[in-house]
C-alpha cells in the first residue's frame, strides 16, 4: 500500500507544472510572428529565434501568422498553452497601436501577455520627393502652414499615422493622411511626386535615400543615425519632445510560470551579449533593446499612454 501511495504521489508531482519546468525546455519551441515572411520584422524574429535556440539547446521554429493587423498571430499565442513553448514576436503596432485603432480587439496586450525582453528598435524618417523644395523640417512646417489645403502625407500603418498626428500636434499643422497597404506603393508615389511627403522606417528607405530617389527630411531618433550623419533629428530641429521608434519584443502568455519566464529572459540576455547580435543590428540598422521583463513592461505601458494621448488629441477612435 505504501509503495502504491508513494508511486501515485510521485506521478502527481511529475505531472505538476513545477516539476515539469525543471527541464525546460525539453522540446523545440515555436515563435509566432504576426506578420508575413520577408518583412523586416520577420528577419528580426528569425535571427533571434536562431540565436535563442542556440542558447537554450532547443530549436525555436518560426511560424508566420499574418493577417488582420497582427490579430491572427496574437490570438495564436493567446490560445496556446501557457508553458513557455510558444513565443510571441510582439511589436509596437500589435502591443500599443491596435488597442487604440481596432474596435473590439480580442486580446489585451497587458493582461494576456507578459514580456520577456525588448528585442530591437529602429528610427523612422520623414521623406519627400527628390525634387521637392522642402530641404529640412523648418521648410516642411512652413510649407504645411502656407499650403491652402492640407498636404498629402503617405503612411502604411496606423502606427505611422499616429506618428504623424503627434508631430502635427506639436507643430500646429494639419495634413491629409493617404493610407497605403504597403511601403512599396507609397515609395512609388513619393518618388513620382504624387505625395508631398511620407513617413517610413529608416531601414526600408535607406537605399532610396542613398541613391537620391527620395529626399530625407529628418529622423525620429534621439540622436542622428551614424550611417546618415547629415540627416538631422526631429528632436534637434525644434521639437525636443519628439522621439519615436518602431520596436519589437518577445512575450509569452501572461500566466506562463515565472521560472520559465526567467529562464527565457536569462537566455535572451546571453543572446544580446553575442557578437553575432551586434553584427546583425548593425546590418539591420536597428538598436538592441536588452530590457529585463520589468523594464519592458514599464516601457510598453508608457508607450500605450503616450500614443493614447496622441490618438485622443487627433480624435482617432477604434473602428
Residue ranges, per PLM feature:
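A ligand-binding cleft/hinge motif common to bilobed small-molecule-binding domains
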Residues: 94-104, 161, 165-170, 197-231, ...
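Hinge/capping helix and adjacent helix->loop/strand transition within the periplasmic-binding protein
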Residues: 79-85, 100-185, 234, 247-280
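Short beta-strand->loop
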Residues: 108-118, 154, 174-179, 196-197, ...
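An extracytoplasmic/periplasmic, membrane-proximal ligand-sensing/linker region
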Residues: 26-28, 169-170, 235-236, 258-319
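Short, low-complexity disordered leader/linker segments with a strong preference
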Residues: 1-26, 319
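Short coil/turn segments
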Residues: 38, 92-93, 121, 129-134, ...
Amino acid at each position: 500500500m505504501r509503495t502504491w501511495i508513494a508511486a501515485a504521489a510521485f506521478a502527481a508531482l511529475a505531472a505538476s507544472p513545477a516539476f515539469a519546468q525543471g527541464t525546460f525546455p525539453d522540446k523545440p519551441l515555436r515563435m509566432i510572428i504576426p506578420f508575413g515572411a520577408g518583412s523586416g520584422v520577420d528577419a528580426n524574429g528569425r535571427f533571434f529565434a536562431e540565436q535563442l535556440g542556440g542558447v537554450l539547446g532547443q530549436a525555436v521554429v518560426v511560424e508566420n501568422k499574418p493577417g488582420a493587423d497582427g490579430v491572427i498571430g496574437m490570438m495564436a499565442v493567446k490560445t496556446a498553452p501557457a508553458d513557455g513553448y510558444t513565443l510571441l514576436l510582439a511589436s509596437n503596432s500589435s502591443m500599443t497601436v491596435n488597442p487604440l485603432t481596432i474596435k473590439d480587439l480580442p486580446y489585451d496586450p497587458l493582461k494576456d501577455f507578459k514580456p520577456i525582453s525588448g528585442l530591437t528598435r529602429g528610427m523612422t524618417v520623414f521623406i519627400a520627393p527628390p525634387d521637392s523644395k522642402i530641404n529640412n523640417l523648418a521648410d516642411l512646417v512652413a510649407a504645411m502652414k502656407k499650403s491652402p489645403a492640407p498636404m498629402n502625407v503617405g503612411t502604411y500603418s496606423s502606427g505611422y499615422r499616429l506618428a504623424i498626428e503627434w508631430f502635427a500636434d506639436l507643430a500646429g499643422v494639419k495634413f491629409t493622411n493617404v493610407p497605403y497597404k504597403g511601403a512599396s506603393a507609397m515609395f512609388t508615389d513619393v518618388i513620382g511626386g504624387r505625395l508631398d511627403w511620407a513617413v517610413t522606417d529608416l531601414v526600408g528607405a535607406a537605399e532610396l535615400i542613398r541613391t537620391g530617389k527620395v529626399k530625407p527630411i529628418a529622423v525620429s531618433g534621439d540622436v542622428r543615425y551614424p550611417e546618415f550623419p547629415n540627416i538631422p533629428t526631429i528632436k534637434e530641429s525644434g521639437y525636443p519632445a519628439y522621439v519615436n521608434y518602431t520596436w519589437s519584443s518577445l512575450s509569452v502568455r501572461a500566466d506562463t510560470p515565472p521560472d520559465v519566464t526567467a529562464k527565457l529572459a536569462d537566455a535572451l540576455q546571453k543572446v544580446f551579449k553575442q557578437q553575432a547580435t551586434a553584427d546583425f543590428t548593425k546590418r539591420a540598422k536597428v538598436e538592441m533593446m536588452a530590457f529585463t521583463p520589468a523594464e519592458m513592461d514599464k516601457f510598453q505601458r508608457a508607450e500605450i499612454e503616450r500614443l493614447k494621448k496622441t490618438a485622443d488629441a487627433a480624435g482617432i477612435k477604434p473602428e
